[in-house]
Amino acid sequence: MKIDIVSVFPEYFEVMNLSLMGKAQAKGLLEIKAHNLRDWTHDVHHSVDDTPVGGGAGMVMKPEVWSECLDELLGFSQPSAATDAVDTSDPGDSAAPDSSAPSGAPVLIFPNPSAPLFTQRDATELSHADHLLFGCGRYEGYDARIPDYYRAQGVDVREYSIGDYVLNGGEVAVSVMLEAITRLMPGFMGNPDSIVEESYTGEGALLEHRQYTKPAVWRGIAVPDVLLSGDHGKVDRFRRDEALARTAEIRPDLIAALDCKALDKADRKTLMALGWEVSAAHPRRLAD
């Protein structure tokens, strides 16, 4: 997978040379390059921002600088003749022309706190892409016409939020998304089975059960006896029940999204004991 990152602080991404990300690059699984947006400026101050049209606080990143940068990285030889045919859909819309399995052409991704939430499903989908191009905003963000323009040129443009909070820039958000995406690539993890039971993974996703290691008793706190029983069936059931219970407490929305037909008898019993009705298409809390 080829990954290009555009930022006014490209040195931020030197951390990508560490740990599994660095090993994946050494093995040829990833090719990561961070670009300095200021390299596409032409004034003595290397300006990348200007005051907001209509007034207001802060500065907005200029479309002229971004367009020169993105045109080059996307392989556009010159501005498209479709310049005037700009898609004016909600810039927070992250839908792609074909969101089933991106590959081949680059996927252009902008972090944006006003956009849809980035999820494990998005990470899984994007892990199949051949080329990801991330744009890191700063200040009050980037001119809204930038993603609109490239959508109109047929580019698969995504805008994602990583949570209900605001950061100083897009670099942290890009790092989060990049790690979530790349670790799902075949060959990235040393043990591919380690991602199978993780939180949010697969259909009917739940929060993962809690984990323990040796010693069996630490500072007077013992691990659950069933985990020491050697009975793999009981261990699996215990972990499944704990995953259901933790999800019901912390993320009840994930329980409510489950397909009751896919639940086995033990799952149903556990959820009923936790106060959920499981006779309909999806579980429903009895207190609701």
Swiss-Prot record:
Listed A to Z, the keywords are: Cytoplasm, Methyltransferase, S-adenosyl-L-methionine, Transferase, tRNA processing
Q: How does it assemble?
A: Homodimer.
* Pfam families per UniProt: tRNA_m1G_MT
Q: What is the lineage of its organism?
A: Bacteria, Bacillati, Actinomycetota, Actinomycetes, Bifidobacteriales
Q: Which reaction does it catalyse?
A: guanosine(37) in tRNA + S-adenosyl-L-methionine = N(1)-methylguanosine(37) in tRNA + S-adenosyl-L-homocysteine + H(+)
Biological processes annotated in GO: tRNA N1-guanine methylation
Localization in the cell: Cytoplasm
Q: Name one GO molecular function term.
A: tRNA (guanine(37)-N1)-methyltransferase activity
List positions binding S-adenosyl-L-methionine: 137, 162-167
Asked whether the UniProt record includes Methyltransferase among its keywords, one would answer yes
Q: Which organism is it from?
A: Bifidobacterium longum (strain DJO10A)
Q: What is this protein called?
A: tRNA (guanine-N(1)-)-methyltransferase
Grouped into one coarse class, the protein's main location is: cytoplasm
